[in-house]
UniProtKB/Swiss-Prot annotation:
Coiled coil: none annotated. Negatively regulates transcription of bacterial ribonucleotide reductase nrd genes and operons by binding to NrdR-boxes. Binds 1 zinc ion. One of its GO terms (molecular function) is DNA binding. Residues 49-139 form the ATP-cone domain. Belongs to the NrdR family. This is Transcriptional repressor NrdR. One of its GO terms (biological process) is negative regulation of DNA-templated transcription. The keyword 4Fe-4S does not apply. It comes from Cronobacter sakazakii (strain ATCC BAA-894). PROSITE patterns: ATP_CONE. Disulfide bonds: none annotated. A zinc finger (unnamed) spans 3-34.
C-alpha cells in the first residue's frame, strides 16, 4: 500500500482489527520511509452478475432498483426494514451462488416473489400482479388461491 503522505511504496501493518460485525478489517499502517501512520479499511468486493432483461439488453445488477421494487410492494405493510434488508441479502447471495456472469431478470423476479411470499402475502400479491401483468380479477383470485394451498 502506498503511503498517502510521501507516496512511498513500502508500508507495514502495525495493527489489525475486525470491525463492522467482522465484515471488514481496520489496519493501522506505518510508512517505512517517512514513519507517518495511517488507517486503512479492507472490505471484500463481491461481484454481482449482470442482468439480462427480457429484450436481451444487459445491465449491471442494481441493488437500489431491487430495494425500490420490494418497498413499493411492501408500502404501508407491517414489515421491518431489517427484514427487507435480510431478504435483499438473501437474493444477492443466491445470485452470486449461481456462479454465472449473467442472470436473467426473470430469476430475480422469481426470487423477489419467493421472499415477499415469506415476508407478507399482501405485498406478494401486489408484486405478482405487476410482475405477471394480471389482466383481471380472476387472475388475482387464482394467485390468492395458490397462496392458500
Amino acid at each position: 500500500m502506498h503511503c498517502p503522505f510521501c507516496f512511498a511504496v513500502d508500508t507495514k501493518v502495525i495493527d489489525s482489527r475486525l470491525v463492522g460485525e467482522g465484515s471488514s478489517v481496520r489496519r493501522r499502517r506505518q510508512c517505512l520511509v517517512c514513519n507517518e501512520r495511517f488507517t486503512t479499511f479492507e472490505v471484500a468486493e463481491l461481484v454481482m452478475p449482470r442482468v439480462v432483461k427480457s429484450n436481451d439488453v444487459r445491465e449491471p445488477f442494481n441493488e437500489d432498483k431491487l430495494r425500490s421494487g420490494m418497498q413499493k410492494a411492501l408500502e404501508k405493510r407491517p414489515v421491518s426494514s431489517d427484514d427487507v434488508e435480510m431478504a435483499i441479502n438473501h437474493i444477492k447471495s443466491h445470485l452470486r451462488a449461481t456462479g454465472e456472469r449473467e442472470v436473467p431478470s426473470k430469476l430475480i423476479g422469481n426470487l423477489v416473489m419467493e421472499q415477499l411470499k415469506k415476508l407478507d402475502k399482501v405485498a406478494y400479491i401486489r408484486f405478482a400482479s405487476v410482475y405477471r401483468s394480471f389482466e383481471d380479477i380472476r387472475e388475482f383470485g387464482e394467485e390468492i388461491a395458490r397462496l392458500q394451498d
